[in-house]
């Protein structure tokens, strides 16, 4: 038997594995965030009621020292993550006096508001409240 023919089954197997792995790569499935202008407006209202005291009226000038939620700090802290990472963090830890007390829709709307203040534009498609679905949405610009 020719030496190259004895390698054929292994080569075919390795090629099949490579194709399957590349098809299952999560980063290939990531998209940019989707949200609506209505979500941004609802998010602005919710932000002003629940977040402004710590993070400020301009998202970077809070009275109680909350970190900036726009600009360089936001990009450096969240830019490599997903929308789901941001929403999951907010739901688990915000507001600090009673984390998780807001509705799923309110957290999602506030995230849409934050996205709109960090260079993302509404595209007319609702940002889903499901954090798993948001994990597929990259914050990388």
Question: Model-predicted segments: where are they?
Answer:
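Gly/Gly-Pro-rich "capping" loops immediately C-terminal to redox-active cysteine motifs
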Residues: 37, 58-95
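Bacterial N-terminal signal peptides
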Residues: 10-22
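N-terminal secretory signal peptides that target proteins for export/translocation
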Residues: 1-8
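Electrostatic cytochrome c docking/interface patches
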Residues: 25-46
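Flexible coil segments in periplasmic/lumen-exposed cytochrome c-class electron-transfer proteins
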Residues: 99-141
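The canonical Cys-X-X-Cys-His
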Residues: 43, 47-58, 110, 114
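An acidic site on a long C-lobe helix of protein kinase domains
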Residues: 39, 82, 102-106
């Amino acid at each position: 038997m020719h030496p190259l023919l004895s390698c054929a089954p292994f080569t075919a197997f390795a090629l099949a594995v490579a194709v399957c792995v590349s098809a299952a790569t999560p980063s290939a499935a990531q998209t940019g965030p989707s949200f609506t202008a209505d979500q941004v407006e609802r998010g602005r209202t919710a932000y002003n009621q629940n977040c402004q005291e710590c993070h400020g009226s301009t998202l970077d000038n809070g009275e109680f020292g909350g970190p900036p939620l726009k600009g360089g700090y936001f990009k450096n802290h969240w830019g490599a993550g997903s929308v789901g990472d941001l929403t999951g963090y907010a739901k688990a830890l915000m507001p600090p006096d009673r984390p998780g007390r807001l509705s799923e829709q309110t957290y999602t709307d506030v995230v849409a508001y934050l996205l709109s203040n960090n260079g993302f534009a509404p595209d007319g498609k609702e940002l889903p409240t499901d954090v798993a679905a948001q994990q597929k949405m990259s914050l990388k610009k």
